[in-house]
């Protein structure tokens, strides 16, 4: 390259430090890099942005793949990549996203902490419905464009804070996302282990090579159950995850303890699964005779004859062929009964969810010492950046206390957003203008994101 042209190009290249103010505003840290809350220096707008600095120098093929996908995907419920900055001097890569003040992991953690403090604040049913509908809408868009997310979990479901998009869900962390219309190799050959254990579909645990978009639907079912109960439905202790073998005895045992062992008539192709022989050797059907999703959800006061349970059952169908699709789920009767889903998931909600906290340079992210924690995700996890994931998934200890930024309680009122193409086919299920508040009153406990909770659930991290 001509030297003078190279010098000119370097001078014209936009530098992230010239455009954005972000010093002292770190909100996330991991082996994938650092995430900062940022604002424009020129005051062109007053929006908050998320700046992710990818760890290391240069850019990997996996990160290139994620960036290429995000540049093409445009949907209200999928995180928007605004810009990519490449620093020529130090070869650092910065990604600019919309900033989301909340995510489902912290929202669920808030409610779980309230239960632990003996003053439970239930997640409003209307909010659960709105969250689920928007997640399905975003995933339907991805699936319609031949994209599998493959790592859906509460930490990857962001929710926008105050602003024009308040209360809107944003599906984030596309580091594991893949096109599935015509892969050159079976997806299982490219990535033998995908999806965080607790949200991993049974066909993945049994070694399915040609898995489908049904794996995302199972994960959504797990998230739905967690929203209803404030507890991970298939929580289990973690083992060594460095192996590329997808088979996981304890995770299957947990699924069977909730769902029961699948009957041959309910999942005819289970005998074709690569790990079926191991399954038969390790498990006995009669061990789980008294286990069922009905019994599990009844303990959490979800009635088996309710539309809520019927949809959950369709999402958590063991046979991937029989599992409901995202489009079918959006048309389910559950979304046609009051309260109807809204564009602002916080509509009518008076619960003071805490904002994201700023981290100091010496302060770890809220998962504690990684060396003392069990690892939950495969060592191929990229955290959406193409670099090894933050293996900070604690099962043995809870998050350490951090410096808390005190935030005042907020009340919410939502507005109508434009209906997506997929909603137009089912106008009755489209977002509704929220009416007066019917949700639970604001808690006086003043919970923050450092509230104590059962440590076995402290396994997530901030994602973009």
UniProtKB/Swiss-Prot annotation:
Q: Which cofactor does it need?
A: Mg(2+)
Highest taxon above the source species: Eukaryota
Q: Where is this region: Disordered?
A: 361-464
What SMART domains is this protein classified in? S_TKc
Subcellular location(s): the record lists: Nucleus
Q: Which reaction does it catalyse?
A: L-seryl-[protein] + ATP = O-phospho-L-seryl-[protein] + ADP + H(+); L-threonyl-[protein] + ATP = O-phospho-L-threonyl-[protein] + ADP + H(+); [DNA-directed RNA polymerase] + ATP = phospho-[DNA-directed RNA polymerase] + ADP + H(+)
From start to end residue, where is composition biased (Polar residues)?
409-426, 434-446
Q: Which residues form the signal peptide?
A: none
Keywords (A to Z) from UniProt: Activator, ATP-binding, Kinase, Nucleotide-binding, Nucleus, Repressor, Serine/threonine-protein kinase, Transcription, Transcription regulation, Transferase
**Residue ranges with Low complexity bias:** 373-391, 447-464
Residues annotated as binding ATP: 27-35, 52
Subunit structure comment from the entry? Component of the Mediator complex. Interacts with ccnc.
Q: Give the similarity note.
A: Belongs to the protein kinase superfamily. CMGC Ser/Thr protein kinase family. CDC2/CDKX subfamily.
Any idea what this protein is called?
Cyclin-dependent kinase 8
């Amino acid at each position: 390259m001509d030297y003078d042209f190279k010098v000119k190009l370097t001078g014209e290249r936009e530098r992230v430090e010239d455009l954005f103010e972000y010093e002292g505003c770190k909100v996330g840290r991991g082996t994938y890099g650092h995430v900062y809350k940022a604002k424009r220096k020129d005051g062109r707008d007053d929006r908050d942005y998320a700046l992710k600095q990818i760890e290391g120098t240069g850019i990997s093929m996996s990160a290139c793949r994620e960036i290429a996908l995000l540049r093409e995907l445009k949907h209200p419920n999928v995180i928007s990549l605004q810009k990519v900055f490449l620093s020529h001097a130090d070869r650092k890569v910065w990604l600019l996203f919309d900033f989301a003040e909340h995510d489902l992991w912290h929202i669920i953690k808030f409610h779980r902490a309230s239960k632990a403090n003996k003053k439970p604040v239930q997640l409003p049913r209307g909010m659960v419905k709105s969250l689920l509908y928007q997640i399905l809408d975003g995933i339907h868009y991805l699936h319609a464009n031949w994209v599998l997310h493959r790592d859906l979990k509460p930490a990857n479901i962001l929710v926008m804070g105050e602003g024009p998009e308040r209360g809107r869900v944003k599906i984030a962390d596309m580091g594991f996302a893949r096109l599935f219309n015509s892969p050159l190799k079976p997806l299982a050959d490219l990535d033998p282990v995908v999806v965080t254990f607790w949200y991993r579909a049974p066909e993945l645990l049994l070694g399915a090579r040609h898995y489908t978009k049904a794996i995302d639907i199972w994960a959504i079912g797990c998230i739905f159950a967690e929203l209803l109960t404030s507890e991970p439905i298939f929580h289990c202790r973690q083992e060594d995850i460095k192996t590329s073998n997808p088979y996981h005895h304890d995770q299957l045992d947990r699924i069977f303890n909730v769902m029961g062992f699948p009957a041959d008539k309910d999942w005819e192709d289970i005998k074709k699964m690569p790990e079926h022989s191991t399954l038969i050797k390790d498990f006995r059907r009669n061990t789980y005779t008294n286990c069922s999703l009905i019994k599990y959800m009844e303990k959490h006061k979800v009635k088996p004859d309710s539309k809520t349970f019927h949809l959950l059952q369709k999402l958590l169908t063991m046979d991937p062929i029989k599992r409901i699709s995202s489009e079918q789920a959006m048309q389910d009767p559950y979304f046609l009964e009051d309260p109807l889903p809204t564009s602002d998931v916080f509509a009518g909600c008076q619960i003071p969810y805490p904002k994201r906290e700023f981290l100091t340079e010496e302060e770890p992210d809220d998962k504690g010492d990684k060396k003392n924690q069990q690892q939950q995700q495969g060592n191929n996890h990229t955290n959406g950046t193409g670099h090894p994931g933050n293996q900070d998934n604690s099962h043995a200890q809870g998050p350490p206390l951090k410096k808390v930024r005190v935030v005042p309680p907020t009340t919410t009122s939502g507005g109508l957003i434009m209906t997506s193409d997929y909603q137009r086919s089912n106008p009755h299920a489209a977002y509704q203008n929220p009416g007066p508040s019917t949700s639970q009153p604001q808690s006086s406990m003043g919970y923050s994101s450092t509230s104590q909770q059962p440590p076995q659930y402290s396994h997530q991290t901030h994602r973009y």
